[in-house]
Swiss-Prot record:
Record has Membrane as a keyword: yes
Keywords assigned by UniProt, alphabetized: Membrane, Photosynthesis, Photosystem II, Reaction center, Thylakoid, Transmembrane, Transmembrane helix
Places the protein is found: Cellular thylakoid membrane
Homology family: Belongs to the PsbM family.
Quaternary state and interactors: PSII is composed of 1 copy each of membrane proteins PsbA, PsbB, PsbC, PsbD, PsbE, PsbF, PsbH, PsbI, PsbJ, PsbK, PsbL, PsbM, PsbT, PsbX, PsbY, PsbZ, Psb30/Ycf12, peripheral proteins PsbO, CyanoQ (PsbQ), PsbU, PsbV and a large number of cofactors. It forms dimeric complexes.
Residues annotated as transmembrane: 7-27
Protein name listed in UniProt: Photosystem II reaction center protein M
One Gene Ontology term, aspect cellular component: plasma membrane-derived thylakoid membrane
Function: One of the components of the core complex of photosystem II (PSII). PSII is a light-driven water:plastoquinone oxidoreductase that uses light energy to abstract electrons from H(2)O, generating O(2) and a proton gradient subsequently used for ATP formation. It consists of a core antenna complex that captures photons, and an electron transfer chain that converts photonic excitation into a charge separation. This subunit is found at the monomer-monomer interface.
Keyword Iron applies: no
Lineage of origin: Bacteria, Bacillati, Cyanobacteriota, Cyanophyceae, Oscillatoriophycideae
Length: 35
């Protein structure tokens, strides 16, 4: 099975972007709750 480079990059971005976004939100809320 040949891997389509564009599809592979799109899949990585599709997974990575929401994960990074959630991590940033999580860290920001933790800093606020810690004071």
């Amino acid at each position: 099975m040949q891997v389509n480079d564009l599809g592979f990059i799109a899949t990585i971005l599709f997974v990575l972007v929401p994960t990074v976004f959630l991590l940033i939100l999580y860290i920001q809320t933790r800093k606020e709750t810690e004071g």
